[in-house]
Amino acid sequence: MTAVRTAALLVCLSCPAAAEDWVALTGPEITQALTSRVLGYPDGTLQDFKAGGQTIAGAATGRWTVQGDLYCSVWPPSDRWVCYDVARSARGLDIRFTGDDGSVTVGRYVDLQ
């Protein structure tokens, strides 16, 4: 029984904590977290968030803004703005974008790796 408890403890320690790992950001915090920063994504794409509202990801150029407590972006040829909840990892290295549909994208600051 002790071996089972030890194994369960080791499994739990290797799992990230659910709510404690991420801190939801407010509008001003989103602006501060993204302005003039570059995030890298698992597929190798880099996204640059320019101070003037331009964002560049790979060969694509779009626009970004903060509306309330949401990050919003538009990527031509679409003219539809899509907004996301934003959270920062507890260690401050990663930014998580969560869409209305529950989709999640996580990027890491390239200057903090």
For each feature predicted by the language model, list its residue ranges:
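Sec-dependent signal peptide recognition
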Residues: 1-9
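Repetitive helical segments and hydrophobic/amphipathic motifs
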Residues: 11-14
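Lipid interaction determinants
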Residues: 2, 16-113
